[in-house]
Amino acid sequence: MSRHNIGFQVVDRVAQISHISIRTKRFRSLYGTGWIDFQQVILSKPMTFMNRSGEAVKKTTDFFHLGMEDVIVVHDDLDLPFGRLRFKQRGGDGGHQGIRSIIERMGGNSFLRLKVGIGRPPQGMDSADYVLDVFDRTEQSLLDQILSQAAESLKVVLLEGLQKAMNQFQKKG
């Protein structure tokens, strides 16, 4: 999988540890429903092109009668060092085409995001090529730990709140 798919990898890890099957094809997504402790969740992965993710998110939220406050989007972030996690509520798209699509389709930006750092491309490499490239050997060796940490941070958000998750998982710097 490419760096651009790290959000999907986090969702897959949440599904794995929560025993939620993501196999239903609907709303231009693959999704599954289940429970994380006492919190009911819908885990969804848009099956559109990245720059049309908003179509799938909008169809899913409309069907399940969810508001923006019920949505957490997990995505890659070039501006964060590899493996760094950062929660953000509101704000612009930061140049991320998938986030831009979600903001446009949802009609606002107040959904919560978990940004997962993928770092900047090496000197001379195009950003588009970099995000579509696979993780290098060093990154690959750290990926399992990062995915587990990201999945755990989402569980903390759901069960104990955003502030607790930010304090526990968001490193300064």
Language-model features: locations:
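Nucleotide and nucleotide-moiety/phosphate-recognizing core
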Residues: 1-90, 100-114, 121-126, 133, ...
